[in-house]
């Protein structure tokens, strides 16, 4: 006889479905470690096996789309770490797990720790771009934190010597593998910051397995990189190796050699820049001289077209002022060119390309000498043209004619007298001599002719 309030009654199908939904929704995705047994792979390509430990076991399935990403062939008795979803196979009521990924137990546990630390540091903001420091350009001193016997150090030094042989390098030797490595790497970073000898650091090592590179997945190393005041370039392993240090560093280089490329400057490129600057300086000086020559020609042309001495004096004053301005401008230009040459010389001395620097300095000295000679020649020619113009103007001036003993007589109305018929007896005349003026009154007018003379008395 059933009770008055009947409990819920499940069919077998509904029961299995309810249990499956509870397992999938409540448990979600989990990580499981265990030993493989009863491994089979039918023609479908799916994997079926059992995971067990000392006291229990569970059935597992890994479908073809997932197992083709596994890089090894599972073996009976092998310890593995799997990421899986818990479910229930409803037709038989079998509880099982659906595996999404599989790794050997050693690397798998490390990978799990890696993912957990990555998520933790990312949540704290250690990977944020706002905290990334810019690398110096150019670097004046590079620090290298790596093993002093490893291939990574050899690769870094080889690239730096090839690209920028005068760049100072300070090595902070440290272990990069083993239990003591994280602590040594942290101390090396702190030491580099205390000494403050370098303006960029390369932290890294050569390639290896996940266990070999694990020192650079250590939380202490990550936090030391983040706390460094000096920008850090991480260079761990090969391009496919990505560590926690890569995420925290200010820049990740795929290899140690690539890191050396990033922090160094190409000496050949610097020489090309110097040559380009020198060429632009020559062009600027040529343009400046042509412009000033054109200006002198215009001034000389205007002086030739203007006669009065007052205007001539003003033009002379203007010319002198322009000459002073030009001299000042040229001196300033030469001074700036000299300062630029000194800066370029210092840079070249730092890079130690002595022979090219010597040739560049010799060329600049030749240009300076040619420039000075050209300016002196043009100034001398301008002064000579100016003197000739003054002499010509003085030669045709009426005042010069008077100075030679001639005189000019004008009537009372100012008209210059050319014939005696313009003069009347008793009229007042003005005669201009070389050194003054004579005022006279006409008492008689005589006109000279070949046959006779005419005389009139007042």
Swiss-Prot record:
Its main location: cytoplasm. It is an enzyme of class 3 (hydrolase). Belongs to the XseA family. One of its GO terms (molecular function) is nucleic acid binding. CDD domains: ExoVII_LU_OBF (cd04489). PANTHER family: EXODEOXYRIBONUCLEASE 7 LARGE SUBUNIT. It is found in: Cytoplasm. Heterooligomer composed of large and small subunits. Keywords: Cytoplasm, Exonuclease, Hydrolase, Nuclease. Signal peptide: none annotated. GO terms for cellular component: cytoplasm; exodeoxyribonuclease VII complex. It holds the Pfam family Exonuc_VII_L. Bidirectionally degrades single-stranded DNA into large acid-insoluble oligonucleotides, which are then degraded further into small acid-soluble oligonucleotides. This is Exodeoxyribonuclease 7 large subunit. Its EC number is 3.1.11.6. GO terms for biological process: DNA catabolic process. It catalyses: Exonucleolytic cleavage in either 5'- to 3'- or 3'- to 5'-direction to yield nucleoside 5'-phosphates. It comes from the Bacteria. NCBIfam families: xseA.
């Amino acid at each position: 006889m059933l009770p008055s309030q009947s409990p819920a009654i499940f069919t077998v199908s509904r029961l299995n479905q309810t249990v499956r939904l509870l397992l999938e929704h409540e448990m979600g995705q989990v990580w499981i470690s265990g030993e493989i047994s009863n491994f089979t792979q039918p023609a479908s390509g799916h994997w079926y096996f059992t995971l067990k430990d000392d006291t229990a076991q569970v059935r597992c399935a890994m479908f073809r789309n997932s197992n083709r990403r596994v890089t090894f062939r599972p073996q009976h008795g092998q310890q593995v770490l799997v990421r899986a979803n818990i479910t229930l196979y409803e037709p038989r009521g079998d509880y099982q797990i659906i595996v999404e990924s599989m790794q050997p137990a050693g690397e798998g546990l490390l990978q799990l720790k890696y993912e957990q630390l990555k998520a933790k540091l990312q949540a704290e903001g250690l990977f944020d771009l706002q905290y990334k420091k810019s690398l110096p350009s150019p670097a004046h001193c590079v620090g290298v934190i790596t093993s002093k016997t490893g291939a990574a150090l050899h690769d870094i030094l080889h690239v730096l010597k090839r690209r920028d042989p005068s760049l100072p390098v300070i090595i902070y030797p440290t272990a990069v593998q083993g239990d003591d490595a994280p602590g040594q790497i942290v101390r090396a970073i702190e030491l580099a910051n205390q000494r403050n000898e370098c303006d960029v650091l390369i932290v890294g090592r050569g390639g290896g397995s996940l266990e070999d590179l694990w020192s650079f997945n250590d939380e202490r190393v990550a936090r030391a990189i983040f706390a460094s005041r000096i920008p850090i370039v991480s260079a761990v392993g090969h391009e496919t190796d990505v560590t926690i240090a890569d995420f925290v560093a200010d820049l990740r280089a795929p290899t140690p050699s690539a890191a050396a490329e990033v922090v160094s400057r190409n000496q050949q490129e610097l020489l090309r820049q110097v040559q380009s600057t020198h060429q632009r300086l020559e062009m600027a000086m040529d343009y400046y001289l042509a412009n000033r020559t054109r200006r002198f020609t215009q001034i000389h042309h205007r002086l030739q077209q203007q006669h009065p001495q007052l205007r001539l004096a003003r033009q002379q004053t203007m010319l002198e002022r322009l000459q002073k301005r030009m001299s000042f401008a040229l001196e300033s230009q030469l001074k700036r060119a000299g300062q630029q040459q000194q800066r370029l010389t210092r840079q070249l001395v730092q890079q130690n390309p002595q022979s090219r620097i010597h040739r560049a300095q010799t060329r600049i000295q030749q240009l300076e000498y040619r420039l000075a000679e050209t300016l002196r020649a043009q100034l001398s020619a301008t002064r000579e043209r100016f003197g000739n113009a003054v002499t010509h103007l003085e030669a045709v001036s009426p005042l010069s004619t008077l100075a030679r003993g001639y005189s000019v007589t004008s009537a009372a109305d100012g008209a210059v007298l050319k014939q005696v018929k313009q003069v009347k007896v008793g009229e007042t005349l003005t005669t201009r001599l070389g050194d003054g003026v004579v005022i006279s009154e006409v008492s008689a007018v005589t006109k000279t002719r070949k046959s006779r003379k005419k005389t009139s008395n007042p």
